[in-house]
């Protein structure tokens, strides 16, 4: 899951702005690179469920005769990883593959450093296997330069089942139900909502709130089209008011808390609910918790008919070694293989990005995710997660983070003031 260098713990962030001089030096250094057959993979899957998934990928690649070199960079948001990647590319020593997402793939493509894996994609029919809303993100100038590994749903609400039973409540489907349940939980001495005080977690929570309050059409106009009137309009103000209201139901120890620590609060029963993408399910699985029994996975209030997607992907970098290039293409092929798609996504909490997969081994949360993905695709309510690098530029996303983080932490700022700031942030270059 991941953020930019100044937002240090988000499920992803990347910038790719280099000078021509630096790239020239990089090319010269790369020309003398060692002829190692090892495939170095930069990723930020370092928490329980995610780390297990990385191990699966390593094992499968090595079964193909390639050597995996692990380049794991802690910091769930990927900001630290992208800083490390930028340094390596400038030095002319990029990893063979790196976990990169959304518009950032295009930015790296513009720098001329990405390797086309179109031959693998064509021979394996990726255009028929990957939904078009996702395959378009993986291509640069019509050629695949990245491979997707999964589909995460972001607009989930995770609930401790016992906590709900203690207050005789059902999973909330509306915001009125949500706050009524939160009041009951608070009176029972249970923290209603677990969150980490990091800007990406605040932004992700707001993203789900905005989708639930305004619907998919509003969401697209505001966060895909960046329409100024919508960003500072009454629906946005209502979404911001709802978002701020949630804060009263969180604990005072949230500063700096990582997302998986917040998930742990729900798992243990210290807290009742968490807004988080379905990478959180990996944490429940590692703790041997069962969906429907120990915990519930439901769409955020009001967002039942929409689906916010977040796709993990690996982009491939140009290298001078034919051996490494073979390993890169082996890795690309592996990422879309049915075997890896099944094992990986069972560990990760996500669903396969490869269409037509047998989901019989997947749990109830995954089945709901897959069904809702398909129905949202048909209804036009499938939307990219702006909070997770899938649609806006890193600059705009970072500016949104700042606005929402400041609003969350400033009790005196009004929702209209925050909405006006979002409209300005959308113009960030």
Where are these regions (language model features)?
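Extracytoplasmic/periplasmic solute-binding protein
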Residues: 140-149, 179-228, 271
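Glycine-centered hinge/linker elements that transmit conformational signals in sensory
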Residues: 182-185, 225-255
